[in-house]
Every structure is written in C-alpha cells, then in structure tokens.
Amino acid sequence: MNIENYLSETLAKVFQKLGYAESFAKVVTSTREDVGHFQCNGAMPLAKFAKKPPLAIAEEIVEHIDAEDIFAKLEVAKPGFINITLAPKFLADTTNRFLNSNKFGVQNNLPNRKVVLDFGGPNVAKPMHVGHIRSALLGDALQRIHRFCGDTVISDVHLGDWGTQMGMLIEEIKLQSPQLVYFDENYTGEYPTESPITVQELAEIYPRASKRCKSDINEMEKARLATFELQQGRRGYVALWQHFVRISIDAVKKDFDSLDVHFDLWLGESDANKFIDEMISYFQANNFIYEDEGAWVIDTNKDGVPPLIVIKKDGGVMYGTTDLATLWQRSKDLDPDEIIYVVDKRQSLHFKQVFSVAERTKVVSEKCKLKHVAFGTVNGKDGRPFKTREGGVMHLADLISQAKEYAKNRMPDENDDSIIDQIAMATIKFGDLINNYANDYFFDLEKFAQHEGKTGPYLLYTVVRAKSILRKIFGDNYDIKSLAKDYKVVNAHNEYEEKLQLQLIQFPIAVQRAYENSQPHHICEYAYSLANSFNKFYVNCPINNLDDESLKKARIALCMATVKAMTIASDLIGISIPERM
C-alpha cells in the first residue's frame, strides 16, 4: 500500500463531495517534518478554477474530513497547504501490516506486464571497464525492481558483435597471421574448433587495429569490406568471428558474475542479422524506404530528428539497422508490453531515430512502449572520464580489486573474504546507484568506501547492527516471518519511534517512484533515510535492559521491520548483507 496514494484517495472523496476535481487531492510526503507527516497542496492550483482563495478551499476541505482513525491532526497553512499528521495507532497498525506482508507493503502491478530490458551491451574483443558499470548496475536494479513489482522480465545483454570493429580485427589478424585457413577463400574443410588467439591477445589486437584504421583511410576501407563480407556470410570470416564472440562471452560472463549481474538472453547484434532481409522487404512493400544518394533511408516524421540510414551505399548495414531488426525479432518472439534500453545518453539521437521509425513502420505493436534510460557518464574526481592513475581506462576487474582493498583497509582484522566482497560490492553499487541516472557523477572510491555518510558500507553497517540485536535475543536461526505474529509495533512512545515508523511505511512510495521513473536512486535514498532513522532509534531507545515487556517487544518488532525493509531495499539494488561486520 502506497501511503501517499491511500491518503490521496481518502481526500479525493472529500474533494468530490464538495464538487472539486479529485485530481487536486494528491498527497505527498511533507517537506517539513515540523508541520506534519504529509501535505496536500491542491488548494493552490484549484483556486483559479474554483474562483475562491486557496486558504478558504483548504479550510473547507479540512472541515469536511471525518477520519479520526487515520489523522491525528489536520492543519491549514498559508497560502493553502493542508498539513497532515497521522494518528499514532494508524501509523503503528500500518507498520505491523507491512511487517507481516511478503513485500513490506508493496503490491503487484495488475495486469502483469512483459518487459524486455536491454542493458550491459559490452563489445566483443574489448575488456569491460569502469564505463560499463552504469549500464550493468542500473539495468540490473531495474530488472530486480520490475520483477519485484510483478512484471515478467526478459533481460538481454545485446552484445556489440557485428559492427566495423569485427572487420578491423579480421584485417589485423590477417596482417599478423596471413597463413591461417580463415583467409583462404578456396578452403572447403572444417575450421579449427580452438581459437587462434586468446581473449588477452584479442584485447591487445583491437586497440592496434583501431589506431591503424583511424590513421589510414585505406586500412579503414579494408576493415569495412571485411565487415561487409562477414555480414554476407564469408565462411572463413564467420568461423573466425565465432571464435571472437565465444572467447569474449566467456570473459564478459566472469565480469558480470563478479557484479552478481545476470541475463536471461545472451544475444548480440548478429542474432538480428537473419531478420534484416525480411524487414527490408516489408519496408519496401509498404513504401517506407527510399533511395537517397545511393543509400536506403526511412524518414522519422519527427521535427529535428533526421532520417535513419538503413542500408549504406556499399550495401552494408548500420547500427540502426540491427537495432530495428532486433526490435523486429523481439516483437515477433516475445511480444512485450515495453522494451527498455539502458544506454549512455550520447546515444539519445540514435534511439529517437530508431524508436520513431519502429513506431511509424509498426515494427513494434501499438501496445509496446519503447523507452531509453539515457544515463550520464562516470567521471573521476577531476571531473573528467574516470581513468587509472596512469591515465588509462580502468578495467572492471581492477576497480573491484581496489574496492576490496579499501574494504580490507577499513577492516584489517576481517579474514572472511566473502564479507570483504559484500562490502566492496555495496561500495561500488550504492556509490553508483545513489545518483539520478540522467546525471554525470564523480566516482570517488575512497569516499564511497566510508562507513559513515551516504554510502553502501553505512547501509550494511546499519542492517548488521539491527540483525545483531535480533540474534542476541533469538539466536542465529531466527525467522522474522514467524516471530512477527507475536511481536507487534505499538503507538510510538517518543519521536524516535514515531520517525522510524513513519520512515518504514514509506517503502512502497520509494519502490513505486523507482519503478515508474526507472530511477533506483529513490530506493537508495529511502534506504539511507531509514538507516539514519534506525540509528537514532538505536541510540535513544534501549531494548535489552527494559523492564516494560510490552515496550520491549514493540521495539524488537521495529528492529524486525527495519531488517526486513532494508534487506528488501538492498536486494533491489543488488546488494547482499553480511551477518556481521
């Protein structure tokens, strides 16, 4: 139950009764704790329609509200705010209801939707680096959130395995080892099952090939021709390319496993290749495509968005072509209600073109919503793209090692590597996801590793503290679900209990905001606020030495509720919680 929605519905009945539009009854969390828990600001925009002063409207609404079981206090403030304080019993009862629910008050979306999430997107032959973090962590958080809210999610890594970089690699290896059978057009036998190069060699070859092509237009033309021949099915090139893909996927899977990020599908641009001819024929039959200076293009019919080139002058396909073909494939095979792309904001124009063409040509059905979660860049403390101390791009494995080193330095006596791993992951993930995805941000590992402030380790420390209270009382194998039947939250005895209860019941609000806006930072902010509220409660509300047994049980129930809410919130952003720190 989203408490903001519940209160909005309660006030909407009064608005309707008085002849006002229900849409003005929206309740939001108060921006000032000193005046109330929640507030309704609808009287101000309503005033110009009702032709009454907003203060008079607010007073009229409050006068007609009859819900003493929900509200302890309703106050009107200039110029027309309605400040709401919840009744202590309603606050306690709602906390208990959430504690005893499987998802801490969050209800499944109805009807169930099918969502395809396209994220990760590493390129074949390139090691994963710090720049891949945002897509991987943001996409993983979104798939966790969507599943939690009841959607059927199909996640696809969508490998970059079909572009000009493949031709660059082929030409570079041909230059290096021309005797390989992959380059003999007359060869008719079976190609070797073992790759002629390792993934480490592949990672070294690509920068060399890229540099050569950028400095020599003739080399770039060779790479483009090799790419075209690969896409046309030249046997030797296809066999060599298959080695590139296989050894790259093995390495990439290890990197994603280290982040606890997993995918349902491991498809690439190449998997859509077989649909391109069928799709082009469809475009031609319906007069969507036309020739322009030797290339084949489709208009977007959107102001400021240029036409999309589908077939190049040389007959090769573009990145946009394979993206359209991927949408064609997903529509036919999966029939989703929504497809979400978690990709760098520098690709925004590209996705505007692709989405516009896909919708105009009905490559996707009318029910299917297309969304680009366009994230900002990861910068170092100097404000520039994040680099190693030597100035190079930091590989993901090196970043994780650094995070583990920071964790170990802060806990030198900790010998359990699994705990160090959990702290390192919390450091990286929370440090990234606490930021609104649309913004660039500074990746400061030293700051993220602190055990105080808005960090992953602080989050873990708080939950471990709450769990240790329960473990001291119930032993190691306690079960919150069964214990909650006998331990109930009661009306708050002081401000610390009240604020903790208030924070606990806002969990569904954070989840709904994260879900609707594709913004996991709402869950991070919630978890941080809950951690602060619990730590103040912990300091000011003793448990173990209490003589009042009913109060003791009520505070234990608040510890249970905190552990449950924090555990779910942490899982939604891909963070696992150790038993101790």
Curated annotation (Swiss-Prot):
EC number(s) per entry: 6.1.1.19
Reaction equation(s) it catalyzes: tRNA(Arg) + L-arginine + ATP = L-arginyl-tRNA(Arg) + AMP + diphosphate
GO biological process: arginyl-tRNA aminoacylation
Molecular function GO labels: arginine-tRNA ligase activity; ATP binding
Principal EC category: ligase
Sequence motif 'HIGH' region, residues: 122-132
Compartment(s): Cytoplasm
InterPro entries cross-referenced by the UniProt entry: aa-tRNA-synth_I_CS, Arg-tRNA-ligase, Arg-tRNA-synth_N, Arg-tRNA-synth_N_sf, ArgRS_core, DALR_anticod-bd, Rossmann-like_a/b/a_fold, tRNAsynth_Ia_anticodon-bd
Domain of life: Bacteria
Keyword hit for Glycosyltransferase: no
Family to which this protein belongs: Belongs to the class-I aminoacyl-tRNA synthetase family.
UniProt cross-references to HAMAP family, sorted A to Z: Arg_tRNA_synth (MF_00123)
Binding partners and assembly: Monomer.
Protein name, per record: Arginine--tRNA ligase
Gene expressing this chain: argS
